[in-house]
Amino acid sequence: MKNNGSLDICYNVQSAVDAQNHFIIDISTTNDINDQNQLYVMAKDATELLNTEECTVVADTGYYNGTEIKKCIDDGMTVLIKKAKANNSTKDNEFWKEKFTYDPERDIYICPTGQRLDFFENTSKNGMKYKKYKCSSCADCKYRNSCTSLKSGRTIQRWEHESVLDAVYEETQNNNNIYKQRRCIVEHLFGTVKRTLGYSFFLRRKIENVDAEAASMFIAYNFKRLLSMFSTQELAEKFS
């Protein structure tokens, strides 16, 4: 998996944690190099285990994947996630895609200098459909070299379901106080397991064995949480 820009040979452990009591609801061990295909399956499993129809999924940028986010939204979940940084062709951040405004009524983009980019073709990549927009005013623009290196002028791609991502972005911005709690909820458990419990690497091999080993450790974590919330006598009464 990816680790600080390099690739490490290791397993990738996913976890879903409830925000109220910080119990681990579900875990999954994968050998994927990143988290981008894990958002929906983890959120779906957690929702089913909690037997709830309402679920707010708070995830870090590593999980940002348009298809995964849309699956969550289609299932009635609320998703709070920061946008991943786009691969922009220009180093000048004043002309990154995020600085361009989309007008849904006219189906055009407006660039930071007020020029318009009109739709000119449909395209697809990795099974995802996009619309492409191009500016016809680049030739005489004094900011051209800061905006694009293409001889034909600046272009922008828009995914067919990008409006879903726009809505998720607005939802995340409006609930930034909730999003900020993510580290305390999820990162806390990994810090506890690694530092307090001293569990920093797996002893088993093969993914099914590692998954069982991780599950055992997280059961111990959940039990530790229980003991911090209830006395031994209270637990005995609850489970008797």
What are these regions, as identified by a protein language model?
Residues 1-240:
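Anion-binding and metal-coordination hotspots
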